[in-house]
Structure formats: structure tokens, C-alpha cells
């Protein structure tokens, strides 16, 4: 069993959600949203340390958990880089605080695949017809996927990829793209359970129904 560090990204402002409080700190069934995933992740034997990337004003939210903190950056990759400075294990799991649902069997699958490949992300097949906008044409959805977190990547690959992104002034849209840009392989692990990211108020209602 490989040991990994967890970087929990909880620094977003949730502008699409339209709340004065960042969405990851809003209550879901009486508990701050971000703590739903942290409760499960921090209990897993594969996770040896937790780094929470958040604004210092919200650190008190995590007082019941043995975590360290990092300051969020302007972009997602900057926040990941900030958390990465405290990582002390050869593998990193990265998760969004706005995604409350975590399943231990999927973490096992991610880590098992990452150990063989180097970088993995949780994903779902696309059930809809997908079209390119300009020019309009239909895309083969069988070759596309919806990407979620957690994502798992070898620490040295993540460091190298983020360094190259900084050098080339690239913006990465997810974490395993750090492997892609340095020519390292990655693989998707398809989810077995419902996945939802809280982006809009109605998503909280859906999440409540799934609890």
C-alpha cells in the first residue's frame, strides 16, 4: 500500500455560486461542505498527511483535524503549488473542497492505477451529445470524459509539470495535465458512485438528496 499526501483545495471564492461565504464552507446537512470529504479522506490508511489550501480566516473550520495549511494562489495550479511545498510523500492526492462525496473504493482504484501509470484522475463517461461550437460539428463522446477529483499524481511528476507550466506561462485546467505537458502518461479511472461539484445553489439541494 502506497502512502500519499492529500492537498485539499479550499481557497476558492465561489463567484458562480453567488454567496458571500465561499461555497465550500456553506452547511450541508449541518456540516461545512468541505468537511464531508475531509472526514473520509483523513480516515484512509493510504493518506499519511493532509495539507489544506485555504484563506487563513477559514483555518478554524479544520480545527478538529490534524492538518497543515498553505495559502491559496491566484489560479488553481498556484494553489496546488503552494500546497506542494509541504508535501513529504512520493504520491499526492488532490481534491476540491467543493466536492463532498468521497468513496474509499475509488481512492483505492486511483492509487492502484497511479502506482502503475504515474497520474490518474476520477472521470465519468459523457451521456450527452457533444458539439464543437465553431465550426459546429459533432464530437465522438466515446473518446471524451468528464473529469472530477480526486486526482492522484507522483509528487516528482507534479513538481516537474508545475515548474514547466510556470516557465512557459501555461494555465493548467486540472492536475494530471502537469503530467501531460512533460510527456508523462496518465489514465482515467471511471467512477462507480455519483459525483457532484457544488457550483450553483441548486447543487446543494442535489447533494442533500444524495446524502
Swiss-Prot record:
Pinpoint the site Transition state stabilizer: 16, 23
Annotated GO biological processes are: isopentenyl diphosphate biosynthetic process, methylerythritol 4-phosphate pathway
- Site described as Positions MEP for the nucleophilic attack, located at 141, 197
Query: What pathway annotation does it carry?
Result: Isoprenoid biosynthesis; isopentenyl diphosphate biosynthesis via DXP pathway; isopentenyl diphosphate from 1-deoxy-D-xylulose 5-phosphate: step 2/6
Q: Name one Pfam family in it.
A: IspD
Give the EC number(s) under which this enzyme is classified. 2.7.7.60
A molecular-function term among this protein's GO annotations: 2-C-methyl-D-erythritol 4-phosphate cytidylyltransferase activity
Reaction catalysed by this enzyme: 2-C-methyl-D-erythritol 4-phosphate + CTP + H(+) = 4-CDP-2-C-methyl-D-erythritol + diphosphate
Question: Does this UniProt record's set of keywords contain Iron-sulfur?
Answer: no
UniProt key word DNA repair: no
Ordered alphabetically, the record's keywords are: Isoprene biosynthesis, Nucleotidyltransferase, Transferase
Q: What class of enzyme is it?
A: transferase
Functional note: Catalyzes the formation of 4-diphosphocytidyl-2-C-methyl-D-erythritol from CTP and 2-C-methyl-D-erythritol 4-phosphate (MEP).
Write out the similarity annotation: Belongs to the IspD/TarI cytidylyltransferase family. IspD subfamily.
Q: Which PANTHER family match?
A: 2-C-METHYL-D-ERYTHRITOL 4-PHOSPHATE CYTIDYLYLTRANSFERASE, CHLOROPLASTIC
Report the protein name in the record: 2-C-methyl-D-erythritol 4-phosphate cytidylyltransferase
**What are the top taxonomic ranks of the organism?**
Bacteria, Pseudomonadati, Chlamydiota, Chlamydiia, Chlamydiales
Gene symbol here is ispD
Amino acid at each position: 500500500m502506497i502512502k500519499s499526501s492529500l492537498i485539499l483545495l479550499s481557497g476558492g471564492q465561489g463567484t458562480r455560486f453567488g454567496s458571500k461565504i465561499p461555497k465550500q464552507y456553506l452547511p450541508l446537512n449541518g456540516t461545512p461542505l468541505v468537511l464531508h470529504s475531509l472526514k473520509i479522506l483523513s480516515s484512509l490508511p493510504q493518506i499519511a498527511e493532509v495539507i489544506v489550501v485555504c484563506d487563513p480566516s477559514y483555518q478554524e473550520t479544520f480545527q478538529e483535524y490534524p492538518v497543515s495549511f498553505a495559502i491559496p494562489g491566484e489560479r488553481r495550479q498556484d494553489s496546488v503549488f503552494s500546497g506542494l511545498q509541504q508535501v513529504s510523500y512520493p504520491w499526492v492526492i488532490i481534491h476540491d473542497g467543493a466536492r463532498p462525496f468521497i468513496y474509499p473504493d475509488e481512492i483505492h482504484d486511483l492509487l492502484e492505477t497511479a502506482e502503475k501509470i504515474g497520474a490518474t484522475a476520477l472521470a465519468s463517461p459523457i451521456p450527452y451529445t457533444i458539439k464543437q461550437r465553431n465550426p459546429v460539428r459533432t464530437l465522438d463522446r466515446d473518446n471524451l470524459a468528464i473529469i472530477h477529483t480526486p486526482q492522484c499524481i507522483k509528487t516528482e511528476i507534479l513538481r516537474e509539470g508545475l515548474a514547466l507550466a510556470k516557465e512557459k506561462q501555461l494555465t493548467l485546467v486540472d492536475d494530471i495535465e502537469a503530467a501531460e505537458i512533460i510527456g508523462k502518461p496518465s489514465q482515467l479511472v471511471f467512477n462507480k458512485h455519483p459525483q457532484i461539484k457544488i457550483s450553483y445553489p441548486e447543487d446543494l439541494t442535489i447533494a442533500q438528496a444524495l446524502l
